[in-house]
């Protein structure tokens, strides 16, 4: 099939509809001929098509038509377009609403876009009547009546016939079409002679169950039947129009309906594009529960017999396979045979006689049961990133479940508690070859962004790795027994005794070095814990091996070590019993006694405080502060438990070094002090969204406690441990948390999945070009992909070494640091980066040497400098800044840290060039990779926990998925969180006093009212401690009261005095007279006074000022003060003295003030911060997404394709159901370049292996052939001449 390079959309014209010869004229009959279920409309449900005789896989369906007897029916989706056009013309005479376009001076084809727009505005002018002297009628406003289902005159609601509108629109001369933005004949907006009946293929049945019996209906077929019925009855225009609208889009005339119609099946989540084209059900697939298998490797997948006997693979007949196919036929292993000449598929059954069908000519194929070592794609849903779907070799395994190697369980987020996986056997040989390379686990070993291995040991293998390293005094036989099948090549090197370290050296098998970890292939660390053997760790031995050699060696280490760990466990055993956890009750009894004693002390102290408040001895704290103090006391109790357990673990290790539970803790697997605290100490405070449960009826959560009880246990503090067991009320509190978490998980899964799809759709067409730049279509997004122009899985985070005077080249390093340090001090100067990005893991090639053999200091500096200059020019074209690379090499290879030979230095830089040249290929789908990594991480995060920054009643800066969602949606006109930072606290305090909301009621005033002869007197007594606590002054309180009364419309006359009652209290006396009705207005005044006498912006949040240590440099810090405030606009800060105050606005304020590039930087850092600690490696995908959102002149939401030239098909698959309608209306022509369009037209997209176009220069072959023939002919002539000489 020819490659489709361009697609044009348009509306069907009436001639095309009339051209079909399948006439539908019956509503119902016995054989369905002439009905909307006519077999001539296409093949369905196994029946061949009666028009072309093909099956439903080959027949694309045929259109029918029903006569509408010269009635004019508007195409429902274009009603608004018709109304738009009618606003430009006079409905009486059909002329445009301005005489100017008819002028002889104007040639519409020569007008500029600007002049055309001006002319169009004149047509839309507010003139009341027609300029045409023969018409002079007032202009009519036409609208569409949902009630009457027809066009009406808006003024008097009189029907306007479709035929009249049709006549007026088709009478508009073609030369005026550009002016009215008409792109095709207006008649195409109507059906006139016939209405089209679509083929059966686009009307799939909708199945449902009634009384356990499957039924199926087809609403579209029913709605088409109604149209045919009305046409046969020769019904009124409105009746047919209504039937057509109900079939096309019922929402045009009815708001609250969910009936299925054409619009429904092309929009929303389950539209036909998504269900049948973008993704659909496939043949040759299987699904089963998964289980672990120790007999298969990371590159294999175990398949049970029933799947192997059901799935079939194709073998194509050619000169190489014909003998094999004959053998398979002879041994009765062939299930199907396809004869290409006869276009016939034959099922071969036992004892079935087949005559003259099997010819075995090239192009034929046979299907046999799937064989071992065939490549098969399998995966676990949800497939959040590409490590969830891989292609491995099939192995036959026992039982009824799919078996996977435990090494890949982490990458697929799989455990073996009933998880299911699916598999699909691809039939196209090209697809099989491609998947067996690109999706093979060895290819996918290292994470695309993180760079660490995605496969590794799990569960008891981690403990085995720890124990194996510590084992001593093994004889050769014991070593060979542990190594099993891998022991044949073990070289004892004359030794008699061996340790676990020797076994690791043999397994590593390479002379590899790594600072503090490996020396010549030998582990020099004190212990082997989980960091060395599990997935997604930078110190993983498999990762270091693959950095040193290739992924093949890395995978081999995982396969061999996994086998050896399992051998070790089967020989020496490992088990954890309850006795390991709790040898006796002494420790738990001691902890319980401590907990009971401490909680009683806390309760006693709290009760004393509450009593003193009640007795008036002390002034109460604010509610938030009181809750903070109680929480801090309970936290101290929790920390006490953890300290006791840590001491207990340390003591147990001394007394019993072989305690298996503590071995697990040391190995970094499972048990930590917090988990032990839940089991042995106390279950702790139960929280919902980070807060204790809120009180409900009678000021309590559960009826187990007294009304308004302040008991911490009544708010969800569970004192008992799990060993002791929970009481009824404690169990309810734990279930309260479980209920909220399970609800959150259900909701968050849906929300994160929706955003993930949007981000992937947004970023899918972003690829690396041939120059190592990131582009989307023809738009340049980034000059250097991954900042290093090296594949993300090759780049490596390394320690950031700060300048130090003890370093060689200190001045040069210091100068470089001053150029790049801004990038490493981030998050409002609160954080200093500890890591930076190295172009590759060069540390595995660093081999220490002696002073005598080392390269000269000057030579090494020159080498680094020359290499970086060369790379800057030849690879980065001096456009991108690569100072960070020079800084890394100068610090990590610094002679003051390590001495290396000249050969080592040359090796490192040869590898550097090798990575630059060969790792990052043009077409790398960096957009999809980044989108998947971001999505996978925020999905995990949303399901694991919800966390925020502030706890002191301030506005909470949300972290996690919610905030990420807000940032990518980029909603306008919402308040933004503005952060102000300064070393001068007074400047922040002036802002705080003006903005922080404080009302009279918060100061706990004692308000009394008395009536004097001619006035009311209100006494307001306030304790000055409350005024001080609110960080305001007595004058501010006086101003608050004064301001409220002066603005009050119910007060007729007023006066005010302030008195100092005593050293603690101040009294404000207000004298009042009210307007009539006096009693009512007095009541209103007293009711609103505590809240209405206020200052600041009304908000439920306080504005506390907190201090922190800010970094100016790695060795320079200063004390800074910070506060966050919610503002709509920065203009509100305009009247304050904010000199030397750093203001960090939100994204839209950043854009308004500093422009698009600043907004990009803000978005990148804000998105990264939502992930919390330990996710610095996500900077690159966050930067890429931020760069895309800010690729135009204004930030653009992930929900929209406002600026980019997104294709119609991309919009349609994204969920825009109007995209195809608009494209057809505007007769759009588009190239087939982007992912969605390529998918639709079966074209290889320009990403990955489809980026480069491969071709053969036939002209070269022809020239070569001519040269050869010339050479041969001249040689023959020479031979003939020689012969003639004789």
From Swiss-Prot:
Q: Does the keyword Nucleotidyltransferase apply?
A: yes
Q: GO biological process: any one?
A: DNA-templated transcription
Q: Where in the cell is it found?
A: Virion
**E.C. number(s) listed in UniProt:** 2.7.7.6
Lineage: superkingdom: Viruses
InterPro entries reported in the protein's UniProt record: DNA-dir_RpoC_beta_prime (IPR045867), RNA_pol_asu (IPR000722), RNA_pol_N (IPR006592), RNA_pol_Rpb1_1 (IPR007080), RNA_pol_Rpb1_3 (IPR007066), RNA_pol_Rpb1_4 (IPR007083), RNA_pol_Rpb1_5 (IPR007081), RNA_pol_Rpb1_clamp_domain (IPR044893)
Keywords (A to Z) from UniProt: DNA-directed RNA polymerase, Early protein, Nucleotidyltransferase, Transcription, Transferase, Virion
Name the GO cellular-component terms: DNA-directed RNA polymerase complex; virion component
Q: Name one GO molecular function term.
A: DNA-directed RNA polymerase activity
Report the main location listed first in the record: virion
User: Which enzyme class, named as a word?
Assistant: transferase
Question: Which reactions is this enzyme annotated as catalysing?
Answer: RNA(n) + a ribonucleoside 5'-triphosphate = RNA(n+1) + diphosphate
Record Pfam families: RNA_pol_Rpb1_1, RNA_pol_Rpb1_2, RNA_pol_Rpb1_3, RNA_pol_Rpb1_4, RNA_pol_Rpb1_5
Q: Subunit info?
A: The DNA-dependent RNA polymerase used for intermediate and late genes expression consists of eight subunits Rpo30/OPG66, Rpo7/OPG90, Rpo22/OPG103, Rpo147/OPG105, Rpo18/OPG119, Rpo19/OPG131, Rpo132/OPG151 and Rpo35/OPG156. The same holoenzyme, with the addition of the transcription-specificity factor OPG109, is used for early gene expression.
Protein family according to the UniProt entry: Belongs to the poxviridae DNA-directed RNA polymerase 147 kDa subunit family.
Described purpose of this protein according to its UniProt entry: Part of the DNA-dependent RNA polymerase which catalyzes the transcription of viral DNA into RNA using the four ribonucleoside triphosphates as substrates. Responsible for the transcription of early, intermediate and late genes. DNA-dependent RNA polymerase associates with the early transcription factor (ETF), itself composed of OPG118 and OPG133, thereby allowing the early genes transcription. Late transcription, and probably also intermediate transcription, require newly synthesized RNA polymerase.
Q: What protein am I looking at? A: DNA-directed RNA polymerase 147 kDa polypeptide
Q: Which organism is it from?
A: Variola virus (isolate Human/India/Ind3/1967)
Lineage, uppermost ranks: Viruses, Varidnaviria, Bamfordvirae, Nucleocytoviricota, Pokkesviricetes
């Amino acid at each position: 099939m020819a490659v489709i390079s361009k697609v044009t959309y348009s509306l069907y014209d009436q001639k095309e509809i009339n051209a079909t010869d399948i006439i539908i004229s019956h509503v119902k009959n016995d054989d369905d001929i002439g009905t909307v279920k006519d077999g001539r409309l296409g093949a369905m449900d196994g029946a061949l098509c009666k028009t072309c005789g093909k099956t439903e896989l080959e027949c694309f369906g045929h259109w029918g038509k029903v006569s509408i007897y010269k009635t004019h029916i508007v195409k429902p989706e274009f009603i608004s377009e018709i109304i738009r056009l009618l606003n430009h013309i006079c409905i009486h005479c059909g002329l445009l609403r301005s005489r100017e376009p008819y002028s002889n001076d104007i040639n519409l084809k020569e007008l500029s876009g600007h002049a055309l727009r001006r002319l169009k505005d004149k047509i839309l002018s507010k003139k009341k009547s027609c300029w045409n002297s023969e018409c002079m009628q007032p202009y009519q406003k036409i609208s569409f009546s949902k009630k009457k289902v027809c066009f009406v005159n808006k003024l008097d609601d009189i029907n306007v016939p479709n035929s009249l509108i049709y006549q007026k629109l088709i009478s508009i001369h073609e030369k005026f079409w550009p002016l009215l933005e008409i792109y095709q004949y207006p008649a195409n907006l109507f059906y006139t002679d016939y209405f089209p009946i679509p083929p059966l293929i686009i009307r799939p049945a909708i199945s449902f169950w009634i009384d356990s019996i499957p039924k199926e209906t087809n609403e579209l077929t029913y709605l088409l039947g109604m149209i045919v019925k009305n046409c046969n009855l020769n019904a009124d225009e409105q009746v047919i129009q209504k039937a057509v609208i109900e079939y096309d889009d019922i929402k045009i005339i009815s708001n609250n309906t969910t009936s299925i119609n054409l619009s429904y099946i092309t929009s929303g989540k389950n539209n036909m594009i998504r269900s049948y084209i973008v993704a659909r059900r496939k043949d040759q697939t299987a699904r089963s529960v998964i289980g672990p298998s120790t007999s298969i490797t990371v590159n294999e997948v175990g398949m049970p017999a029933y799947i192997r006997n059901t799935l079939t693979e194709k073998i194509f007949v050619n000169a190489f396979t014909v003998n094999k196919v004959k053998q398979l036929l002879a041994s009765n292993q062939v299930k199907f045979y396809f004869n290409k000449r006869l276009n016939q598929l034959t099922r071969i059954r036992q004892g079935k006689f087949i005559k003259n069908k099997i010819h075995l000519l090239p192009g034929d194929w046979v299907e046999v049961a799937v064989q071992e070592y065939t490549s098969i794609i399998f995966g676990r849903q949800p497939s959040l990133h590409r490590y969830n779907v891989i292609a491995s070799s099939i192995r036959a395994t026992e039982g009824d479940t799919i078996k996977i190697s435990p090494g890949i369980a982490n990458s697929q987020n799989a455990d073996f508690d009933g998880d299911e996986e699916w598999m699909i056997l691809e039939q196209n040989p090209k697809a099989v070859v491609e998947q067996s390379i690109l999706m093979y686990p060895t290819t996918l070993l290292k994470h695309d962004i993180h760079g660490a291995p995605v496969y590794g040991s799990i569960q008891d293998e981690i403990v085995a790795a720890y124990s194996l390293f510590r084992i001593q005094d093994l004889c050769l036989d014991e070593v060979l027994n542990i190594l099993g099948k891998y022991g044949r090549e073990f070289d004892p090197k004359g030794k008699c005794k061996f340790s676990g370290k020797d076994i690791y050296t043999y397994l590593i098998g390479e002379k590899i070095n790594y600072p503090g970890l490996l020396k010549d292939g030998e582990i020099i660390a004190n212990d082997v814990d989980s960091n060395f053997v599990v997935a997604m760790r930078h110190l993983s031995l498999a990762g270091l091996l693959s950095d040193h050699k290739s992924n093949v060696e890395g995978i081999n280490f995982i396969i061999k070590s996994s086998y050896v760990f399992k051998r070790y466990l089967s020989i020496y055993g490992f088990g954890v019993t309850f006795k390991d956890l709790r040898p006796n009750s002494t420790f738990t009894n001691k902890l319980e006694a401590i907990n009971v004693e401490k909680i009683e002390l806390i309760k006693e102290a709290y009760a004393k405080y509450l009593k003193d408040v009640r007795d008036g001895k002390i002034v109460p704290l604010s509610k938030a502060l009181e809750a903070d103090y109680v929480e801090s006391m309970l936290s101290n109790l929790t920390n006490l438990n953890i300290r006791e357990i840590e001491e207990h673990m340390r003591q147990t290790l001394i007394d019993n070094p072989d305690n298996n539970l503590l071995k697990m803790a040391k190995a970094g697997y499972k048990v930590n002090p917090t988990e032990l605290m839940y089991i042995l100490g106390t279950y702790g405070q139960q929280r919902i969204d980070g807060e204790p449960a809120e009180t409900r009826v009678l000021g309590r959560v559960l009826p187990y406690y007294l009304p308004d009880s302040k008991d911490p246990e009544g708010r969800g503090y569970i004192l008992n441990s799990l060993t002791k067991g929970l009481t009824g009320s404690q169990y309810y509190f734990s279930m309260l948390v479980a209920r909220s978490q399970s609800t959150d998980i259900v909701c968050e899964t849906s929300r994160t999945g929706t955003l993930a799809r949007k981000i992937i759709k947004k970023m899918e067409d972003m690829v690396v070009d041939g120059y190592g730049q990131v582009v989307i279509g023809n738009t340049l997004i980034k000059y250097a992909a991954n900042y290093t122009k090296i594949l993300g899985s090759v780049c490596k985070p390394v320690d950031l070494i700060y300048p130090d005077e003890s370093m060689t080249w200190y001045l040069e390093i210091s100068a470089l640091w001053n150029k790049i340090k801004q990038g490493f001090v981030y998050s409002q100067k609160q954080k200093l980066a500890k890591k930076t990005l190295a172009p590759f893991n060069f540390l595995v090639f660093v081999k220490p040497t002696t002073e005598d053999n080392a390269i000269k200091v000057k030579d090494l500096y020159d080498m680094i400098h020359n290499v970086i200059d060369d790379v800057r020019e030849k690879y980065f074209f001096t456009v991108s800044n690569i100072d960070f690379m020079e800084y890394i090499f100068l610090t990590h290879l610094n002679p003051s840290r390590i001495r290396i030979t000249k050969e080592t230095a040359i090796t490192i830089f040869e590898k550097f060039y090798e990575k630059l040249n060969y790792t990052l290929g043009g077409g790398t789908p960096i957009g999809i990779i980044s989108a998947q990594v971001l999505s996978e991480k925020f999905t995990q995060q949303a399901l694991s926990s919800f966390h925020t920054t502030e706890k002191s009643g301030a506005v909470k800066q949300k972290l996690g998925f919610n905030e990420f969602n807000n940032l990518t949606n980029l909603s306008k006109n919402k308040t933004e969180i503005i952060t102000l930072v300064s070393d001068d606290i007074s400047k922040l305090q002036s802002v705080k006093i003006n903005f922080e909301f404080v009302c009279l009621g918060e100061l706990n005033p004692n308000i009394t009212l008395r009536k004097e002869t001619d006035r009311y007197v209100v006494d307001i007594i306030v304790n000055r401690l409350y005024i001080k606590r609110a960080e305001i002054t007595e004058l501010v309180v006086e101003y608050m009261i004064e301001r409220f009364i002066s603005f009050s419309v119910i007060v007729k006359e007023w006066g005010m005095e302030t008195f100092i009652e005593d050293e603690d209290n101040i009294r404000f006396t207000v004298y009042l007279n009210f307007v009539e009705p006096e009693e009512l207005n007095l009541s209103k005044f007293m009711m609103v006074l505590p809240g209405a006498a206020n200052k600041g912006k009304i908000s439920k949040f306080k504005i506390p000022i907190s201090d922190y240590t800010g970094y100016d440099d790695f060795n320079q810090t200063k004390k800074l003060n910070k506060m966050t405030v919610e503002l709509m606009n920065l203009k509100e800060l305009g009247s304050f003295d904010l000199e030397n105050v750093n203001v960090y606005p939100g994204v839209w304020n950043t854009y308004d003030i500093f422009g698009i590039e600043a907004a990009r930087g803000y978005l990148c850092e804000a998105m990264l911060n939502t992930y919390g600690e330990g996710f610095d490696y996500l900077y690159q995908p966050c930067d890429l997404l931020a760069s895309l959102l800010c690729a135009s002149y204004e930030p653009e939401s992930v929900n929209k394709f406002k600026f980019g030239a997104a294709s119609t098909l991309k919009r349609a698959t994204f969920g825009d159901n109007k995209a195809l309608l608009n494209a057809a209306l505007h007769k759009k022509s588009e190239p087939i370049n982007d992912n969605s369009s390529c998918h639709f037209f079966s074209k290889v997209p320009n990403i990955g292996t489809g980026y480069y176009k491969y071709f053969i220069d036939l002209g070269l072959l022809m020239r070569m052939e001519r040269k050869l023939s010339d050479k041969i002919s001249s040689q023959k002539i020479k031979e003939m001449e020689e012969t003639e000489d004789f």
